């Protein structure tokens, strides 16, 4: 599955690159391809969460921090579709980009911690975390090109850093914090996917988005 995701990601990224090389790639096409990348990113994070669930202790979810503790929780984002529809296109794109870039270092941390997790599928988990990085980088490049085409927002947001550089000193803490960090990413990747699909719909000037 990783090879399939990687092949499609490279193909979609190559298509997004056409716009920066002088080829006539319309905004709708660029948003379509960015939406496909974001959909794959969220699907991959869901698959990774399911892998962790197979051997995750029930007590772990009780001890896990609340979603409000995610490092991106303070980033102001639309709460629902109606609110997102009132946000200008350039600003909504800036929000999606800030969310995505906030995960550069956390995804690197997840990939570095995955091989030593106390989990029987840590090899597969490691492969998927690396694939998350590749997908995220591909989408980031696509969003940069979209911002260049649409124009930057006057309310451009900055990425939020992750505080702390490790997941804990004992195996249980590391597994719980790994799961928590992944759950935060899954939530944010869902937001990014929704925002990009909404932008795609608005670019197509559909009556109902």
UniProtKB/Swiss-Prot annotation:
Disulphide bond pairs: 70-184, 201-209
Keywords: Disulfide bond, Hormone, Secreted, Signal
Pfam families: Hormone_1
GO biological process, one term: response to nutrient levels
Location within or outside the cell: Secreted
Recorded superkingdom: Eukaryota
GO molecular function: hormone activity
GO cellular component: extracellular space
Secretion signal span: 1-24
Regions annotated as coiled coil: none
Family that this chain belongs to: Belongs to the somatotropin/prolactin family.
Name used for this protein in its record: Prolactin
